[in-house]
Amino acid sequence: MQTTDVAILVPAFNPAQGWSRQLLDEWECFRKELGDMSWSFILVNDGTTTADFEQELSYLLSEEPSIQIIQQPVNLGKGAALRKAMELARANIYLLTDIDFPYTTESMLRIINELHNGSGADITAGNRKKDYYKKVPWLRSQLSLFLRWLIRKRLHLPFDDTQCGLKAMNEKGRKIFLQTKTNRYLYDLELMVRAVAEKNITIKPVPVQLREGILLRRMSFRILFQEATNFMKILLFRNRL
């Protein structure tokens, strides 16, 4: 695969109806801001079961045939999907985001420019402001805040917002990402724990903001139980370092 300036990596699992048009609209805005930077775009279908997904995917590719598709027949989780994309991608900067491009174009540019402009960062991680939690379901916001507290008190990381879905990294960051084992949502946390343990990796939090009108999903109790188990695994891994 040809090396590009930026690779955009996006997982997809049962996205909302009309996702393809929304993705194209947001992608068009972002692509214009990339200017003359070369890009690649990889979308991973992580075992989607909705009836209209293939139809929407066909429309997406008819409008933007350069997007590469990875098909996973069963749902393995966001972390597993992004690792699959990361294995295929070749770029100077790898940008991770969600299928609805929930963060503003300015936020995405800020994330990659901190790497592109030679700030010394290897991984840039979105840092969500307090008003973010007013825009998400109550239970999800409380769980996110509780996780941030746990990260400060139990994992002792230099920053507590590990779960923002908007991140970017260079090749050094990519190599650490490919070492992660967590398949679902807490892959971010494992990535940060591994990166902090490396002496030659620099992580920079970057302020980001949600787009207006974004509605985030509620989490099922099954997923919450799985993530609690994953947190304990990551905690044990951290304690062994």
Q: What kind of feature is each model-predicted range?
A:
Residues 74, 80-88, 105-178, 185, ...:
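Acceptor/aglycone-binding surface of glycosyltransferases and processive sugar-polymer synthases
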Residues 45-54, 101:
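A conserved acidic beta->alpha catalytic loop
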Residues 10-26, 47:
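Active-site beta-to-alpha loop of glycosyltransferases that engages the nucleotide-sugar donor
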Residues 1-6, 10, 17-18, 32, ...:
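Hydrophobic helical membrane-anchoring modules
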Residues 25-37:
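Short, acidic, metal-binding catalytic loop of nucleotide-sugar glycosyltransferases
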Residues 54-88:
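Conserved donor nucleotide-binding strand/loop of the catalytic core
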Residues 35-48, 68-72:
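Short beta-strand/loop segment that forms part of the nucleotide-sugar
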Residues 94:
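Short aromatic/hydrophobic "clamp" motif used to bind/position activated sugar donors
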